[in-house]
């Protein structure tokens, strides 16, 4: 397809003349059939809803086709409308547009659907089993058409993948405002999502899937590296001061979990990651994100022993069920140093977790046709997995929950994961590592994408970012010196670690000062021509301010506000009028539907003074909103960080907490009994 044909296809939107039906491509990793949940009347409504995108002349043909999709897959994806052109992040100049910001958003959307990047590209799922960009291909086509027509004085409203339309606004307003799976709180249970998604009225956007900010497994690998490195440091003794030879065991080689083996190798440990889906394991192996594939535990166990003995930095994928792996490690008394889990347990009944003793294929069939039996198998599997993990922790393994709802779903299954006082016996990684060491000080997963598509532009941004962090490090207080040192090492090594999958993007944990100064350095480089095209700034929603999640991002908030969502909602509103190019707010993401509220942003910078102003105003709020909230929760690191920010930033005044003597309070209560 020529560039002109590609651009014409984008501008056409939903074509008046329907394209030919497309065969089901079995070479692509597809989503499993979804649960059959709709009543006969609701099935009528689902098809009626889908036909809204098409003129009546096509309804008879498409109604039959959509009914078949609903029967076979549990959803209406409109495969017929999947474009013929290759899906990937093109250089920004190749997108037809009236507004440069809109072209950047088109680039980001296509990256999320690139088959090298997305988990189930033909079902518009980027990662996590159900993290959707759109619900169907009509929504994709119509959205791209709107973006190609958008001016600097319009804003596109996106309702769970549905483009509501272009509305008049102004150049400083966001070009796109995204909401995903925002529902009335009483209707936020898993079956509510299944029903609403099957009806075509809501979608689970995960975090960066539905907000057009996913950058492949690199997007989580820096945070995973930080986590593994600091978990390993918890195992250090006077005689053991490095991670070499340590064994790290976990599961998952999907869009997010696929970062684990690379993070383990960067950290210097032996990583063994189980993955039940052969296509997912093969994909990560071909991309170089995992070093070895093993299909037999009889072969894997001796290989693990040798790698640990020889202190290799190596990653291995076990293509099989993680419970079999844990039980074998426990039975063989293999000394595991670090353990975690990244199965998609936010989505346990629809492909996020595969039970032991049931094949991958049989599980996919059972979850759709016998959901009650499948649930029983999953819960029994979780109980067995926890039993094996408990045996290994009794021998010294440090196990942490990776914020995927593992402990939550294991507890619901009756597994032995509860400790004293009704608390989980194992910490989340945010409680032990990410929260007190990073989020409380404002460090989080800042990221950027070079819209030129040129590797040399990305190399320059790496150098600029490293220079900024090194300058900050010279006068940094001791309490954040270690974080800065790790992040400087990361960005200096990023190119050599071959992290790019999809767009020319980079992830870097940075605080408010670092993010702002790095972005300003990029903006100057665009202005003087050293960078050849605009840069998109963004972050994961898994950040200082972006997510309220009591089992993950806000699990180290202990003042009782961990169940509130004011921070995430305030954050997206504040970003929207301080300069974000697009903003998003989601229900779910990470731990699951009904358990989280999270949001994010994208900002296109183009070398202008307007971009510099937006950088200063928006990035300050985007980080310090969360620090202020964490400070009010009496987190010591956050109190220190917000005091420094108030000294640095004129006009910033934050309410600080006063410490109360808990023993005094207890005595008062006793006196009043």
Which residue stretches match the model-derived regions?
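Short, solvent-exposed amphipathic alpha-helical segments in soluble enzyme
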Residues: 265-267, 330-334, 415-418, 526-527, ...
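Small-residue-enriched alpha-helical segments and adjacent helix-cap loops
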Residues: 535, 539-570
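Glycine-rich beta-alpha junction loops
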Residues: 278, 320-323, 342-347, 403-409, ...
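Short catalytic-loop micro-motif centered on adjacent basic/acidic residues
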Residues: 247-250, 314-318, 400
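Residue-level detector of anion-binding/catalytic polar loops
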Residues: 270, 335, 398
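Catalytic or ion-translocation cores adjacent to nucleophile or general acid/base/metal-coordination motifs
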Residues: 205-229, 233, 239, 244-247, ...
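Active-site/ligand-binding-proximal alpha/beta "capping" segment
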Residues: 315-343, 350
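Long, compositionally biased, glycine/small-hydrophobic-enriched stretches that function as flexible linkers
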Residues: 1-198, 202-217, 371-521, 525-538, ...
